[in-house]
């Protein structure tokens, strides 16, 4: 494995930018290839078999780009595949979210907002219970929040109303921890924190995931030894909304995005 190879980041759309941002904070000299499957987003309502197929196509494409590792920045993908089936070093956001939730909670009452597919898989429920069998896990699918992010936002009042509708019922459950079980959701963090106020710890799994990636690279002498990190953005759909959302979140209005035809993944 070439330590100077790029790190691949996969998401169904623009949400994985939240993971890229955390990685850039602690591994700024690494090269990254971000792949957003924006033509086929959202994944959350698709069957497991279809998600597996799409993921295999993207991973194989990234292998051809000589990536040294793949970061799955999509909880829906993580809940649909077995990472051991892929012959490449792979890190997953969902596992980081499970660990973060268990570490954050004091009363063992944890809320999870995610996509329909992630909720139905019960991956968070089972994972949290595996680490804390006494935990109470309350889940809710919030596909409308994914669409808000992918479409490049609406007016603030509309976003707040959608976030409130999705999250306020958790407060009645006396949760002390809320997991953002979809990488799109940290983009809406100011609105989420406004709804839950100071009563709940909001967990962004990308923080732990980024530290796990760095820890592995350091311990296995895989940290890039050349200076000056570069980022390549690849999408399968239209570029405009991706550039708008990603550019805003990364504070970079001039990101270059290349569109990849689905046929190139076959």
Swiss-Prot record:
Pfam families: Asp_Glu_race (PF01177). The lineage of its organism: Bacteria, Bacillati, Bacillota, Clostridia, Thermoanaerobacterales. InterPro entries: Asp/Glu/hydantoin_racemase, Asp/Glu_race, Asp/Glu_racemase_AS_2, Glu_race. SUPFAM superfamilies: Aspartate/glutamate racemase. Provides the (R)-glutamate required for cell wall biosynthesis. The keyword Zinc does not apply. GO terms for molecular function: glutamate racemase activity. Substrate binds at residues 11-12, 43-44, 75-76, 183-184. It catalyses: L-glutamate = D-glutamate. The active site is at 74 (proton donor/acceptor), 182 (proton donor/acceptor). Belongs to the aspartate/glutamate racemases family. Pathway: Cell wall biogenesis; peptidoglycan biosynthesis. One of its GO terms (biological process) is regulation of cell shape. Keywords: Cell shape, Cell wall biogenesis/degradation, Isomerase, Peptidoglycan synthesis. It is an enzyme of class 5 (isomerase). Its EC number is 5.1.1.3. Coiled coil: none annotated. This is Glutamate racemase 1.
